[in-house]
């Protein structure tokens, strides 16, 4: 009776570990397949550059010094525009 219980629990543990590992591999493979093409990344880059420079120009028109806008997502503001870090 004890041996049967130990065998069942061991099989259950192996099954759980195998299922978890399989799910992780599947998730990793989906992440590798689903990526933004370079053209989409370029469009995002251009959009952020435009937004930052326009924001800076609007601030200049108010007769105030242009304050550096905090750019997000790996960008920094330099020379009144967003630059990829």
Swiss-Prot record:
Localization per Swiss-Prot or TrEMBL: Secreted
Disulfide bonds: 52-66, 56-77, 71-82
Keywords: Disulfide bond, Neurotoxin, Postsynaptic neurotoxin, Secreted, Signal, Toxin
Tissue distribution: Expressed by the venom gland.
InterPro entries, alphabetized: Hwtx-2-like
MF annotations from Gene Ontology: toxin activity
Keyword match Disulfide bond: yes
Signal peptide: 1-22
Superkingdom in the source lineage: Eukaryota
A Pfam family it matches: Toxin_20
Keyword Transcription (UniProt): no
UniProt propeptide residues: 23-48
GO cellular component terms, A-Z: extracellular region; host cell postsynaptic membrane
Functional summary from the UniProt entry: Postsynaptic neurotoxin.
Family in the record: Belongs to the neurotoxin 12 (Hwtx-2) family. 02 (Hwtx-2) subfamily.
Protein name: U4-theraphotoxin-Hhn1z
Organism annotation: Cyriopagopus hainanus (Chinese bird spider)
Source species taxonomy: Eukaryota, Metazoa, Ecdysozoa, Arthropoda, Chelicerata
């Amino acid at each position: 009776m004890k041996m049967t219980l130990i065998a069942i629990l061991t099989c259950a543990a192996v099954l759980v570990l195998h299922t978890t590992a399989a799910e992780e591999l599947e998730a990793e493979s989906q992440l590798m397949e689903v990526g933004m093409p370079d053209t989409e990344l370029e469009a995002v880059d251009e959009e952020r550059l435009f937004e930052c420079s326009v924001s800076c120009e609007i601030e200049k028109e108010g007769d105030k010094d242009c304050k550096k806008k905090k750019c997000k997502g790996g960008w920094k503001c330099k020379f009144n525009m967003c630059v990829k870090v």
